Amino acid sequence: MNDSGYQSNLSLLRVFLDEFRSVLRQESPGLIPRLAFYYVRAFLSLLCQYPNKKLASLPLYRWINLFIMCNVMTIFWTMFVALPESKNVIEMGDDLVWISGMALVFTKIFYMHLRCDEIDELISDFEYYNRELRPHNIDEEVLGWQRLCYVIESGLYINCFCLVNFFSAAIFLQPLLGEGKLPFHSVYPFQWHRLDLHPYTFWFLYIWQSLTSQHNLMSILMVDMVGISTFLQTALNLKLLCIEIRKLGDMEVSDKRFHEEFCRVVRFHQHIIKLVGKANRAFNGAFNAQLMASFSLISISTFETMAAAAVDPKMAAKFVLLMLVAFIQLSLWCVSGTLVYTQSVEVAQAAFDINDWHTKSPGIQRDISFVILRAQKPLMYVAEPFLPFTLGTYMLVLKNCYRLLALMQESM
């Protein structure tokens, strides 16, 4: 599991579909091959977007990673410089959407470059239940929840991978049907972006932007999947914690033995709390970028859809697609964040449901009461200094997008 070399990651991706199908074919819940985290990390490594200690020790890998980030920043600036050339509000909106998207891509891959070693530690921390608490678990309820989470995560990867490839094809094929433009409105030195003046250079740039777009979309998809898997695995661990707490009430043992088992479960709870704090620190920059980009992308694409509907239906359809992508992306973050929020407060109910806990010794009753009190403070993934990823934040973002949309309509 700890071997994260380039060849081992390639081998892991080769067996992904076989392992996924083997889990789907299980008639009763069994052990999962590995956490779905490892597939995403392997894909990021193959994209040269995961320079952890082991891969960064390879000079070629390190230089490729730096080249990729420089390439993204270069394309961002060519798009930014082209912004004054926009002829109307529709073209300007199109440029702003892509500039926002490219800024989001760069921010996320930059933070992945900085935090990949911390993410390795997080992935290892999520193995705590199987490694420390219950290394040889055969409980069908626990195995069933682990299997369900594995299937959801892996299925999400597969479906998002297909959707992103469709979106990528729409980006670089659409200009071919138009006026011979680059996939992104850009300005290059010596007017290399002009098909009539530099046809060979134009087609080189066209292919280069298309390949960069495909690589960027795959990269941001996998970075997002790391974050969403962090949310889902946290919710799963909290669910397993609730199961372990409730099972304590079924134990017919002495108070001393009960207290030993209870302390093991409490250590698991403390581990989850610390894990959420570590994840918030590791992903904070990416969380902030996600909230700001979601707000801008939803607002601009919705406004441009309405502005272009009567003038340019093709552009309107393009903005609808961009709006849906932004909605889906924000929805995934907020729904999975809400799972963590709701499951963390369920721990208090699980502790209260321990059978006959009021008949235990005063020390045990005090410890259980402390767990109930602590669990009433929900665990949240927060984009500090902004809001947590919950459905409440989702509705707040949509409400503010609507207000901004109304303001832009009035200004026209």
UniProtKB/Swiss-Prot annotation:
Superkingdom classification of source: Eukaryota
Segments on the Extracellular side according to the record's topology features: 96-103, 191-229, 324-330, 411-412
Family assignment from sequence similarity: Belongs to the insect chemoreceptor superfamily. Heteromeric odorant receptor channel (TC 1.A.69) family. Or49a subfamily.
GO biological process, one term: signal transduction
Tissue expression summary: Expressed in olfactory sensory neurons in the antenna.
Function: Odorant receptor which mediates acceptance or avoidance behavior, depending on its substrates. The odorant receptor repertoire encodes a large collection of odor stimuli that vary widely in identity, intensity, and duration. May form a complex with Orco to form odorant-sensing units, providing sensitive and prolonged odorant signaling and calcium permeability. Plays an important role in sociosexual interactions since its enhances courtship in a pheromone-dependent manner.
Transmembrane segments: 75-95, 104-124, 170-190, 230-250, 303-323, 331-351, 390-410
Subunit organization: Interacts with Orco. Complexes exist early in the endomembrane system in olfactory sensory neurons (OSNs), coupling these complexes to the conserved ciliary trafficking pathway.
Entry keyword set: Cell membrane, Membrane, Olfaction, Receptor, Sensory transduction, Transducer, Transmembrane, Transmembrane helix
GO cellular component, one term: dendrite membrane
Gene (name only): Or47b
Its membrane topology: Multi-pass membrane protein
Subcellular location: Cell membrane
Name of protein: Odorant receptor 47b
GO function terms (MF aspect): ionotropic olfactory receptor activity; odorant binding; olfactory receptor activity
Miscellaneous note of the record: The atypical heteromeric and topological design of the odorant receptors appears to be an insect-specific solution for odor recognition, making the OR/Orco complex an attractive target for the development of highly selective insect repellents to disrupt olfactory-mediated host-seeking behaviors of insect disease vectors. Odor-evoked OR currents are independent of known G-protein-coupled second messenger pathways.
